[in-house]
Amino acid sequence: MRVATADEVEEFEAVSVRGFENEAATITPGRIHPPAILDEPRMVLWLGQVEGKPIGAAMSYRTDEAVGIFGVTTIASTRRRGYGTALTRAAMLVDSGLPSILAPSPEGEGVYRRLGYEQVGELRIWSRQT
């Protein structure tokens, strides 16, 4: 479902942390995604639910040239059931007239290849220690 309220942003953030960390992980609400993120019309947060319980998340950000898909995750106990694929499809269709791009984790590469994505380059990440 498309996140539309501050409470849903909080659920989105919590399930994102649980998906990327572990199912017992917690976070202070608004630490990563404050409710004001809903004011950004190009950003869409997606919350996957099964029987009303949050199980996964994804984000899409639309520019004039493409839709970027980020942060696709599901909690460990719900993986390998197609939920990550469904969340990615929802994010892809935010503006179906534009191509979509993403930078997959090694675990997600197979999912994205099955959805028709192709590798077009190498992502270089830079870091500066403080």
Give, region by region, the residue ranges found by the protein language model.
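A conserved beta-strand-loop-helix scaffold within acyl/acetyltransferase catalytic domains
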Residues: T26-I75
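Conserved active-site alpha-helix within GNAT-family acetyltransferase domains
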Residues: T85, P106-L123, Q129
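Conserved acetyl-CoA-binding loop-helix of GNAT-fold acetyltransferases
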Residues: F70-V94, R114
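Short beta-strand element of the conserved SAM-dependent methyltransferase core
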Residues: W46-G48, I125-R128
